Amino acid sequence: MKHYSIQPANLEFNAEGTPVSRDFDDVYFSNDNGLEETRYVFLGGNQLEARFPEYPHPLFVVAESGFGTGLNFLTLWQAFDQFREAHPQAQLQRLHFISFEKFPLTRSDLVLAHQHWPELAPWAEQLQAQWPMPLPGCHRLLLDEGRVTLDLWFGDINELTSQLDDSLNQKVDAWFLDGFAPAKNPDMWTQNLFNAMARLARPSGTLATFTSAGFVRRGLQDAGFTMQKRKGFGRKREMLCGVMEQTLPLPCSTPWFNRTGSSKREVAIIGGGIASALLSLALLRRSWQVTLYCADEAPALGASGNRQGALYPLLSKHDEALNRFFSNAFTFARRFYDQLPVKFDHDWCGVTQLGWDEKSQHKIAQMLSMDLPEELAVAVEANAVEQITGVATNCSGITYPQGGWLCPAELTRNVLELAQQQGLQIYYQYQLQDLSRKDDCWLLNFAEDQQATHSVVVLANGHQISRFSQTSSLPVYSVAGQVSHIPTTPELAKLKQVLCYDGYLTPQNPANQHHCIGASYHRGSEDTAYSDEDQQQNRQRLIDCFPQAQWAKEVDISEKEARCGVRCATRDHLPMVGNVPDYEATLVEYASLAEQKDKAVSAPVYDDLFMLDALGSRGLCSAPLCAEILAAQMSEEPIPMDASTLAALNPNRLWVRKLLKGKAVKAG
């Protein structure tokens, strides 16, 4: 069975207050002066102080083999801040740090370890505040308003490097080869790791390590680095430095899921909901020139316009990609929303998913068997549900303590307002009719004879995405739904958490003293007219799931208050994020893919045309990470997702899976 919780570091603090690993019998940093050793070995060994002012790109990427207490990262971050203060006009503006850790520290141990270096406190406190829960995979932390990005990969580095997407190849400017000493932790110091370091290193990229072990030097040379010895720090006689002086050939392991970015930095986004709003922010942070075209007269009039939406992950014991994506998307979303410098109605009150019948009880039992971290999800017995939710249901379930609700409409509006302050241009009542290539750009034809030309285009317009010739064959479908707005009552007012059953019920929003009950589900429909039948069904589903609950019968729908919207969904419940695939070319190029995988060309896509769509009913959870993934891909930066999960988000995935099995593909 797949486990979704990572084992934390097993450590103790010695007489000097230095953390020591019980498993590896080694210190996390020098008892003498760990901070100075980091500056000498890793910053000095990679010549970063001299390289930063002369670096010709806006982003510098550092990768590290063992995060530990984060000393190397914090020291580098401090040095990077000092560089930016001294050279405000330098080309280099942002720092990206990628680190791998098999046994992450608990937050409490991290805080204790950081007390060693009071001079690093301003940076350490920011790291502590965002320290992720022990889930496998990549945790992206956006620090210093996005000027510093930390990708923490939890798991075995030798396993993780083989799971990295090809888009990370030749992206790393400097390697910090750190970790417990080779004699203490031989499983990490392998030729497999050295080869991965070479694959990820940019031509002329560097590396530094505290060890001078001969097998390490020879292994790195065999991988492609030019190595040399340097005087070690303090009492250590020698250390190693290296340079990638060659350009290694890089075969693409899965060309049918290959992702391409763009060298251009000017984009039009078609949308107006949460996906386009968050993508605008992510691209502006990367210095893109962004224009948004919205078909409506105001933002968030589509699927993002609800008063309250629940935030919690979608989990399934039988779907590895779904679990990996949504668990990491959920934790990223919470960190992201907590940092946003905009106001929006929300309450991280928790979400409880209830087993209201035999099928839902079985599903929850399977989820609980996945060894999830307690910070993510915990079992709750029927007699405890009333205590944590405030209402009696006679059902057991699963609770997401960090979940809750937020107002999507307010979030979307205020994020777009923030983006406008950062340079976003918005045009309302621009209904895109079609788009076509013209002189290496995209010509956009809008209703009422309006036209515009842009270098890059992103389609983030929900269920309307399939209205264009380039996207008409995508396997997505519309789902119309009605959310009921009901006034609170003395009993309903006791509800403290979001309840999920065969529907959902939110606690009252203090801003309007109403609850939301959702939502009806009409697959294939785009009808947004109010429905008395849907209103009644929303109420009845609540009563049917909790027949003994008097509070459920108090739900009053007589005001006929509701909101109808249309979602865009996929069969596998995952979003579509990436290049817009060329359907006809895919069928031609991959006609014999099942028999000729070794001859496969890169996935046929439309140049400089991307999509962020099909968020279904979990857009509040998935949109922040999807926006970050797409912005990173478009900007040719490291993507915070492993290759197999990233493939499960690829817009061509449903076609390619069939073609890999030699099956016929139908449009839509």
Curated annotation (Swiss-Prot):
Instruction: Output this protein's name.
Output: tRNA 5-methylaminomethyl-2-thiouridine biosynthesis bifunctional protein MnmC
- Keyword Methyltransferase attached: yes
Annotated gene: mnmC
Q: Give a GO molecular function annotation for the protein.
A: tRNA (5-methylaminomethyl-2-thiouridylate)(34)-methyltransferase activity
Q: Which organism is it from?
A: Shigella dysenteriae serotype 1 (strain Sd197)
> Per the record, which residues fall in region tRNA (mnm(5)s(2)U34)-methyltransferase?
1-245
Q: Which cofactor does it need?
A: FAD
Spell out the Gene3D superfamilies in the cross-references.
Answer: D-Amino Acid Oxidase, subunit A, domain 2, FAD/NAD(P)-binding domain, Vaccinia Virus protein VP39
Could you confirm whether the keyword Ribonucleoprotein appears in this record?
A: no
Q: What is its EC number?
A: 2.1.1.61, 1.5.-.-
Q: Where in the cell is it found?
A: Cytoplasm
According to its UniProt record, where is this protein mainly located?
cytoplasm
**Record-level GO cellular component terms:** cytoplasm
**Keywords annotated in UniProt:** Cytoplasm, FAD, Flavoprotein, Methyltransferase, Multifunctional enzyme, Oxidoreductase, S-adenosyl-L-methionine, Transferase, tRNA processing
Matching HAMAP family, A to Z?
MnmC
Q: Which domain of life is it from?
A: Bacteria
Q: Function of this protein?
A: Catalyzes the last two steps in the biosynthesis of 5-methylaminomethyl-2-thiouridine (mnm(5)s(2)U) at the wobble position (U34) in tRNA. Catalyzes the FAD-dependent demodification of cmnm(5)s(2)U34 to nm(5)s(2)U34, followed by the transfer of a methyl group from S-adenosyl-L-methionine to nm(5)s(2)U34, to form mnm(5)s(2)U34.
SUPFAM superfamilies per the UniProt record, alphabetical: FAD/NAD(P)-binding domain
Q: Which family does it belong to?
A: In the N-terminal section; belongs to the methyltransferase superfamily. tRNA (mnm(5)s(2)U34)-methyltransferase family. In the C-terminal section; belongs to the DAO family.
- From the UniProt record, give one GO term of the biological process aspect: methylation
